Amino acid sequence: MQRIIDREIEKTIDMKRLGQLVPPYCVVRQYDNIRGKTLKAVMGKYTVLILLWNIHDKRHRTLDKPGHFFVISTRGPEPCVVFSSTGMTPKKELFITQSDPTLLERILPKGTVYNNKKLQINRNSNTCWRFAILYAHLAPMGLKKFQSLFTHPSVHLSNS
């Protein structure tokens, strides 16, 4: 059973297939290819946007390595949410991927809420797309409720 789980965890996904697995209010794009001066211009008619950060070298050339999917949502109770399964700030992830940080700085509105809970517990980079699909479908519930789905309740045992 563990072999099956390990094999499934290793599976990657391409952007076309990912786009087929998300709700109609969601679109999947490459971070490097989005254009627009505002979040509304970038998202168009969609309320959830899954973006792929490609990995770059220090000269900002795209490398042939798996990237990282993250989500921007205006669909839930919060005005705008940036969700990454790593729980890292976009600034840190952009530094790791060597992607252009000015794009997010330019389009994200004030008051944007960021996921700071680490949900991707293994070091496998192929896990993020699964969380992106989940968040895309469940974005209407909001970030806090989504995070609570992955929080273990504390159990207290007593012998009285």
Regions found by a protein language model. Name each.
Residues 30, 115, 135-160:
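Contiguous terminal or domain-adjacent regions
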Residues 47-144:
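Cysteine protease-like catalytic core of ubiquitin/ubiquitin-like
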Residues 39-40, 101-105, 158-160:
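Short amphipathic alpha-helical segments and helix-helix/interface helices
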Residues 1-80:
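Cysteine protease catalytic domains with a Cys-His-Asp triad
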